[in-house]
């Protein structure tokens, strides 16, 4: 994983590829040379788990390197593109990623390790989720087996984004009335 990830100083520093080798979805034209933006969160969690277990600093440093790249990639409005070019880091379209994986990753860095440097990701990300994704109920699926090129709003709805964000909202240290109401609406959307 480390050897396949982007080196420090590159546009996607420390990000591993979503698509590699000769696997089924790696062969799809729409995935070649691309990566799902939020897939690096899973690698970040894995590096933190390895650090917790082994105490080896390099794993902790890689996890923070991934968070640093997310800090740099966040758009002014708090959003992230769903998929990006793996070499340049440029978005392949304007479809926004649903941010629950990233928000949970940043929450872990804050709660378990006391790191506050990335809290701005949470602040801006929650604002975007609430004002755009939740407000419009455009909870776009984040599946690599779907071509996101030309994806229209509401074309790829799924409970796999609505339900996890509802869970994130309900598991916050302080759940506001707005968080609760949004979570209830998202759960209802998931049931439909």
Labelled PLM ranges:
Residues 1-192:
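Glycan-recognition and catalytic cores of secretory/periplasmic carbohydrate-active enzymes
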């Amino acid at each position: 994983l480390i050897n396949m990830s982007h080196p420090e100083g590159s546009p996607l520093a420390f990000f591993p590829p979503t698509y590699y080798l000769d696997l089924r979805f790696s062969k799809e034209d729409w995935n070649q040379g691309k990566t799902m933006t939020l897939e690096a969160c899973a690698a970040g969690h894995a590096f933190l788990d390895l650090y917790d277990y082994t105490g080896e600093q390099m794993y902790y440093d890689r996890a923070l390197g991934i968070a640093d790249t997310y800090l740099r990639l966040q758009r002014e409005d708090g959003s992230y593109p769903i998929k990006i070019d793996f070499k340049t880091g440029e978005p392949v379209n304007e479809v926004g990623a649903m941010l629950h994986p990233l928000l949970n990753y940043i929450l872990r860095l804050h709660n378990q390790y006391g790191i506050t440097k990335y809290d701005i990701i949470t602040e801006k990300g929650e604002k975007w989720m609430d004002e755009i994704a939740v407000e419009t109920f455009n909870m776009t699926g984040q599946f690599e087996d779907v071509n996101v090129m030309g994806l229209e709003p509401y074309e790829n709805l799924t409970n796999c984004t609505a339900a996890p964000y509802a869970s994130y909202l309900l598991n916050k240290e302080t759940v506001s009335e707005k968080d609760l109401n949004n979570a209830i609406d998202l759960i209802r959307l998931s049931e439909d």
